[in-house]
Amino acid sequence: MPALEVNFDGLVGPTHNYAGLSYGNVASLNNAASFSNPQEAVLQGLEKMKAMHDKGLTQGVFAPHARPDLNILRRLGFSGNDAQIINKAFNADPILLRACYSASAMWTANAATVSPSPDTTDGKVHFTAANLNNKFHRSLEPATTTRLLKAMFNNQNHFAHHTHLPDQGFFGDEGAANHTRFCDSHGEQGLEMFVFGASAFNSHLPKPVKFPARQTLEASEAICRLHNLKDTSQILLQQNPDVIDQGVFHNDVIAVGNANVLLCHQQAFLNQQQALQDIREAYVGNKQFYIIEVPTSKVTIQDAVSSYLFNSQLVSLSDGSMLLVAPKECQRNSAVNDYIEEMIMADNPINQVRFFDLRQSMQNGGGPACLRLRVALNEQELAAVNPDVILTDTKYTQLCNWAQRNYRDQLGAKDFADPALLSESYQALDELTQLLNLGSVYDFQLEG
């Protein structure tokens, strides 16, 4: 059955800030304590969404999470009304409070892993929210993510939703940032590539030394089971631990795939040549499979991480070609820009590039690919999706107006002591749930 891939981009939340919370994420650490501009951030993301819509692609919208997370502050011993809790937390532990204000749910590549219906034995699209338990501020996300997914994909005949994996390091799961699907077309059976950083139980597999491996082999295996994946639709590979120690905290910082193309760095995988051969042999399609391996001599790991070349989106266009959606940092890096120009002139489906200014997200370590969750859907499945989360010209205008009304243009450390930021944020999200027809998905709505 004909199908297409829909990118559901995360709307940046009203409390977007630079707290340097993500150890192993170089950009996040380097920009800690800088002033942020939430309004600019959300509008930059919306501009990218609108550009994809204008290209003829079906584009979805993924709502942000409610922040600050007062429930976790209550669990950690802070009491009183909302303003008192914020005041106490700000005075006792301002870093903790900033973590509870984090807008990291904007990076929906970490929201969940999605398996399309052609790959599953029951013919349904499967979703499992990521537990994200390697980082405290991200571990707060899975319950709300699951509620949002159920509000967006709310038809049991087509969609299966699973509880996130156990909240424990042995099953550390970072979602689609470590997952790519290869196929001849989105409506045909594909090969789902799961990339892990380490094994919790197998001590013989190497591990990074400096930075943590956030995705475990055991988590990836569990997702394959939960999603009822066909044996021929799954392959598990280990990321090169050496590049994790150089700031490649997810596979989507060192590789990106789409349909019958894998674009990866020469050092992306452990035992790379064998890994690439395994992918070629496991590919279930009939089309030529392209592996574009970027040599270190042309793009160093440092350049890959600073430019986020591999955190670009790779999307299929109606004429069968592919577009690389890259951050402007790639254009500013001469080595990376030269390689992109060489690549789009070579014999492969990628024949054009478009650069976007996503500086607000990039400074926290998230490029174009971080901001989107890919969901392949056939016509019946797309018709079953909540239509109000699909971007239209009208919806784009409504969302821009909503953001300009509700978002501040600067946030610094002292602003997190202001209870008005909470009320502004909650009011904005309450309005957004009506705009996207999500119902009650946030704790403050469910408890009110």
Curated annotation (Swiss-Prot):
Binding-site list for substrate: 19-28, 110, 137-138, 214, 252, 364
Pathway: Amino-acid degradation; L-arginine degradation via AST pathway; L-glutamate and succinate from L-arginine: step 2/5
Keyword Hydrolase appears in the UniProt entry: yes
Location of the active site: 174, 250, 370 (nucleophile)
EC category name: hydrolase
GO molecular function: N-succinylarginine dihydrolase activity
Domain of life, per lineage: Bacteria
Keywords: Arginine metabolism, Hydrolase
A biological-process GO annotation: arginine catabolic process to succinate
Keyword Cell wall biogenesis/degradation recorded: no
Catalyses which reaction(s): N(2)-succinyl-L-arginine + 2 H2O + 2 H(+) = N(2)-succinyl-L-ornithine + 2 NH4(+) + CO2
Entry's EC annotation: 3.5.3.23
UniProt similarity note: Belongs to the succinylarginine dihydrolase family.
PANTHER family tied to this protein: N-SUCCINYLARGININE DIHYDROLASE
Stated role: Catalyzes the hydrolysis of N(2)-succinylarginine into N(2)-succinylornithine, ammonia and CO(2).
Subunit structure: Homodimer.
Full protein name: N-succinylarginine dihydrolase
Organism: Pseudoalteromonas translucida (strain TAC 125)
Gene from which this protein is expressed: astB
